[in-house]
Amino acid sequence: MTPSIIDTHTHPFDAAFDDDRTEVMARAAEAGIATMICPAIDSASHDSLFALCDSYPDMCRPAMGLHPTSVNDNPDWRNELDIVASYISNACNRRFYAIGEVGLDFYWSRNWQKEQTEAFEAQVCLSLEHNLPLIIHTRNAWPEMLDVLRTFKGGGVRGVMQAFS
């Protein structure tokens, strides 16, 4: 019997898979991947995310969020958060399975630490409001991540960590 595996974080909708996406998805299924949680990165990723989930409805589950590096040097990041909140509030009649990919990433720079932290906190609040788990991305920001999560201690925050250092 092949194991039934859930991949809690994957981006097969990325353009890097445009040439062999069908084969990638078939290999995943053959390997026992039953479900893939596919987190958004920013609004530029939404169309390809939704197309993938529509093409593989029995396997792919969308997650909605704003990746921390999509906040960097982006004057419209608050608008991006509004788009995330609108989708989560069911503006598109889709079910989302998590809030993600969210978090803090200071690997490249700390110049946007304040903005990333604000965006992450807002998305933690969204996850609590809608009772959805988080898909948390953390690079070179572990102490700061713990500081944010501690502010929600006892509040029911849940999810998975990925890309952490």
What does each model-found stretch correspond to?
Residues 1-165:
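Mid-domain alpha/beta scaffold segments of enzyme catalytic cores
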